[in-house]
Amino acid sequence: MDAFGDYVWPRATSELILLPVTGLECVGDRLLAGEGPDLLVYNLDLGGHLRMVKRVQNLLGHFLIHGFRVRPEPKGDLDSEAMIAVFGSKGLKVVKVSWGQSHLRELWRSGLWNMSDWIWDVRWIEGNVAVALGHNSVVLYDPVIGCMLQDVPCTDRCTLSSACLVGDTWKELTIVAGAVSNELLIWYPATALTDNKPVAPDRRVSGHVGVIFSMSYLESKGLLATASEDRSVRLWKVGDLRVPGGRVQNIGHCFGHSARVWQVKLLENYLISAGEDCVCLVWSHEGEILQAFRGHRGRGIRAIATHERQAWVVTGGDDSGIRLWHLAGRGYPGLGVSSLSFKSPSRPGALKAVTLAGSWRVLAVTDVGSLYLYDLEVKSWEQLLEDNRFRSYCLLEAAPGPEGFGLCALANGEGLVKVVPINTPTAAVEQKLFQGKVHSLSWALRGYEELLLLASGPGGVIACLEISAAPTGKAIFVKERCRYLLPPSKQRWHTCSAFLPPGDFLVCGDRRGSVMLFPVRPCLFKKPGAGSKAITAAEAPGAGSGSGGSESVPTGIGPVSTLHSLHGKQGVTSVTCHGGYLYSTGRDSSYFQLFVHGGHLQPVLRQKACRGMNWVAGLRMVPDGSMVILGFHANEFVVWSPRSHEKLHIVNCGGGHRSWAFSDTEAAMAFTYLKDGEVMLYRALGGCIRPNVILREGLHGREITCVKRVGTVTLGPEFEVPNLEHPDSLEPGSEGPGLIDIVITGSEDTTVCVLALPTTTGSAHALTSVCNHISSVRALAVWAVGTPGGPQDTRPGLTAQVVSAGGRAEIHCFSVMVTPDASTPSRLACHVMHLSSHRLDEYWDRQRNKHKMIKVDPETRYMSLAICELDNDRPGLGPGPLVAAACSDGAVRLFLLQDSGRILHLLAESFHHKRCVLKVHSFTHEAPNQRRRLILCSAATDGSLAFWDLTTAMDKGSTTLELPAHPGLPYQMGTPSMTVQAHSCGVNSLHTLPTPEGHHLVASGSEDGSLHVFTLAVKMPEPEEADGEAELVPQLCVLEEYSVPCAHAAHVTGVKILSPKLMVSASIDQRLTFWRLGQGEPTFMNSTVYHVPDVADMDCWPVSPEFGHRCALAGQGLEVYNWYD
């Protein structure tokens, strides 16, 4: 298939690549990063702007960049110009650049040198370049002339897994080669007697029991570090490697990684290693782990670089992320865990509870009823009071706020509550609230205006106490405001509380896992039909007289809104209000985002904490606008950042079942707990956050399986969409309106990510991610795309409903709203609300007669989704589209979405294909004076296509849907309207397009690399042709049919008909190919090689006449192409 000269249009060009970062190097205050064949340059001058300066596209052609080597300058000045050798795979190129603080200019570039072997290392030798190749040979190359000067092999021509070149001249050049035999071979290329004469190894070093992946030599100390497949790092004393015959001694064997170690770097005082476990470890030269950097996701950290002067470590991962970390001695160090030495003969009794009043005062109570204070500035214990009534059972809680407002509360097993001013404990005020045990205490603070203390007693009664201070500040007043009543449950007490801004409602969580909304002032809350009943204190179960005498206090106010068992049976651990939303955490390893609308609680999104954190204890908002999650992972207390996916603090405390407390301010964070009868304290200066910088956000930790464009947001010039390029280097006309494409991706890492892709910047911003799936996400579908304010609203923004599906027969529906926000780097804010979900095994478990049915395979996977929007006036089904799913168990299933996606119901299914269904696609047929018809096409692993008439099937009274064999099961779809045997094996891509003649073009791509294109005609019989009362069923037939057997060299995973005359296809052979249609068999026009391996999905869309079309390719990374009409 030769290209016709007249049809070179369109030509696709790459504008964005998100691939694993495989090369990093610090040059002065700049960072060079290799992503695929592209070179990224960052400015690391923290006094200026920390951002990308330049992206040099396609520098190494089709090779991936694995490293950079900068030519040493005689004066050591690399601040203005640098000569850089860029290498990777089998390619090498030398580039001379001139750079400043905010620009980079390419002065000269050599040709691409294609080697016949893999390049493991490159070193500058007196203006030339020495290259270590994959079969143990060294080549000397002149980059200016572009010719090879020397080619010296070793006598041992084994395959290498790594290499390191040492020396500044050809005479002293030394190569340390890591052979696949797990040995280090040290030899000297200059000792060859004649050209191309093999050189025998000078030394062989063994010790590792796996392949050696990386090595680093520190000349000043004569040390060599090696990283291996055996998950260890070894340190060798080698002396001066340039001198033959030296002794090699193993002086360190470091085990700390849980998987293979990819990279190692030796510094004067540290050893840095990174591996497949996504952890970067900092070691001392004695083999002690000093720091551990965790944050990357996926299959490992592929590249590391260091900046010794600034004490920085830079890591690049498989998730396309680049992070900068501070070595010990920089930033805000942790002070570690220390014992506060409570045990003393002068302090009798055993500790019962501990809490924090601010970050520098610790309160503790003993089993003899004594309350003690420890001041971190004074560093001594002080007894505040002793009360024998609190000796057998005592609860202790300090008021929230920076310094606890100087208040704490005690409660005992006889219904007594005492509020104690910490500075003046003699002014304590007590009230007897109940006749029985006080189960829990919690504080609720509204700014500096209102402070409430909630105490749970018998029978689910919560006493709400209002705390106020005298004008002199030396006395406090405690007044019972009201009483609330919890819903019935076995363990009927509240666990946490918070004010809901502006302060009309109080949010509480209970031990049963429910979240409830109570009115703060019940006397002012008048809601007709609410059903809340107010009773007096004398009527309340277990109620007794308080300090107010026999005054009747209204009590028993029930919640105005309840989310029952939101966190399961283990209980709610915290509730927090921030940014107009309510966040709740629980011991079900998750946290919920909620909001209140019309006095009712509504869940927005459920998020999972880090793996292993089953007890989520709370969350905190940090100054940069993000949040951190507090929780327990086995016997460790963990502070985890959802934004950076990093465990910021880890304290081995023994678990969350002991008494503990946490407090944080901008100056410091503190965590105290009881262990072995002592009060232990962990403090870290600088608050919860750690001083690391995310140069670029990671995308997904595993392969991207699906990509779908949602829509476009247009931002005006007032939002100033940031550009990666310097303004001087922008092309004319590219400074137009800020068009930003919103794209969603699904991945094997079980997450769905919402991306913003500006058309003018060549960048990508991860707006948010959804983590509701328990297995991989395989398919996405979008419907109901609109604007936040409706069709009449001209303000920028985007709303859409998204359906995601994948492994474990799980499907989720959620809504996405994107609005302008000038405070974010992307200038956009994204809000996601989870609407509904469905799992086949859960659906089966709910059936009454399930013992009579065959259970659905829980390992069923949804392979593809299609939205089928029927007519709104159809009877019987109500408003909402259908979602068609291709299933691995051989079924085509139809789900009905109702109530704007809040109800997801399995309606019908068919096992017509009897094998794995790979693709589904829906399209509509419209003809003059005829009813709009909705047709579904499904494709299976045998290469067959089936077409279903959904309009007829969904009509009321239609006989197309067969009744199920048992009540509660879905309907049966019957037989399809037409089948076509398009391929000899599985169909991985499918698309249709209506033609001007009223027909439909159907294109499919197969696993054998073939394409199949045919024209489908839909004909409706005349009413007089129908037999009696028979339904008018459309007749489908194929008019023209063409096949291209060898369109690609591998699976065709994406096909899109752009117009009746143009089609584009993508394959695992990494070629994006354009085909000419309309003149018989599809004709090859041109092809572009892309850099994403194992492409699984493709989506194309028109942007505008000025920006043409865009195409997103998803696989082991993401790449965006564009072409112009």
Curated annotation (Swiss-Prot):
Transmembrane segments: none annotated. GO terms for biological process: G1 to G0 transition; negative regulation of autophagy; negative regulation of cell population proliferation; wobble position ribose methylation. One of its GO terms (molecular function) is tRNA binding. The modification N-acetylmethionine is found at M1. WD repeats lie at residues 53-97, 105-143, 147-189, 200-238, 247-285, 289-327, 335-376, 381-422, 425-470, 476-520, 559-598, 604-642, 645-684, 739-785, 848-897, 905-950, 974-1016, 1040-1077, 1083-1125. It is found in: Cytoplasm. Keywords: Acetylation, Cell cycle, Cytoplasm, Repeat, tRNA processing, WD repeat. The keyword Cytoplasm applies. Pfam families: WD40. SUPFAM superfamilies: Nucleoporin domain (SSF117289), WD40 repeat-like (SSF50978). One of its GO terms (cellular component) is COP9 signalosome. The keyword Metal-binding does not apply. Its main location: cytoplasm. Belongs to the WD repeat WDR6 family. Together with methyltransferase FTSJ1, methylates the 2'-O-ribose of nucleotides at position 34 of the tRNA anticodon loop of substrate tRNAs. Required for the correct positioning of the substrate tRNA for methylation. Required to suppress amino acid starvation-induced autophagy. Enhances the STK11/LKB1-induced cell growth suppression activity. Interacts with FTSJ1; the interaction is direct, and required for 2'-O-methylation of position 34 in substrate tRNAs. Interacts with IRS4. Interacts with STK11/LKB1. This is tRNA (34-2'-O)-methyltransferase regulator WDR6. It comes from Mus musculus (Mouse).
